[in-house]
Amino acid sequence: SIAGTFDALSTTAIPHQHGTAIASLIAAHGRLMGSAPDAKILAVRAFDPKDAGAQGTTFNILKSLDWAAAQGARVINMSFAGPTDPAIHRSLEAARKKGIVLVAAAGNAGAKSPPLYPAADPNVIAVSATDADDKLFEQSNRGRHITVAAPGAQILVAIPDNGYEMSSGTSYSAAEVSGIVALMLQRTPDLTPDKVKAILRATAKDLGPRGPDAMFGAGLADAYGAITADVAPVAAAGRRPVERVSTGAR
């Protein structure tokens, strides 16, 4: 499923399981099937692993976004979170205007955290995380910028060296929504980013307080509802290859 790779760092590559996990939720083929198994992955390394986490710079993120756009990515998954950055905002705005759908993890800093970026950027589909009972994942960020929610607690993911593990976080809920978006574009390739966001909101299963809220946005993303939504104009019938998805992974 890997259509291309890009390393924005000048250091020697160190394997990081976060990117493998994200890609597996989108397009895995094996005991674990991704939500969009026909998707072609553009794997990007923009973050330098440091102990348990990873560190990124504005320059490396911008290089990675530019590369993904140049490769024809239709969806960019951004499973990372940090402070607002004007340069990254301009890059995201340009990408959306080119027709690229941008999906980002809300963050795992909890209820008291301010909005984190790029999820809080207006050009982005922001995804919070739910648990097995459709309750908000305790560590998930909240905010009026949340578009939809998706499962993100105790998720089975692939890791390097043919392994699997259970892991939690909004990174995984964002990946699941990126897979849904890839399927939407497979069915209707001419969907715009704004239309994709509108469909996700309109077809989501309402959770929490009635109507949109700061925890779940419009509600739990509904893959079937989003893919089968009545959209005009509808693409010609027939199986189409899923457009390229950049994982934006570490």
What are the roles of these predicted feature ranges?
Residues 1-5, 10-58, 74, 96, ...:
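Subtilisin-like serine protease catalytic core
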Residues 15-18, 36, 75, 79-81, ...:
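Loop-rich non-cytosolic ectodomains and luminal regions
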Residues 23-26, 44-47, 74-75, 138, ...:
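Hydrolase catalytic cores
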Residues 29-31, 130, 152-154:
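Short loop segments at secondary-structure junctions
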Residues 42, 101-104, 125-127, 149, ...:
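Structural detector of well-ordered beta-strand residues that form the stable sheet scaffold
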Residues 46-123, 131-138, 142, 160-174, ...:
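Substrate-binding/access-modulating region of protease and related hydrolase catalytic domains
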Residues 107, 228-250:
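Secreted peptidase-domain scaffold signal
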Residues 146-147, 222:
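Substrate-binding/active-site groove segments that recognize
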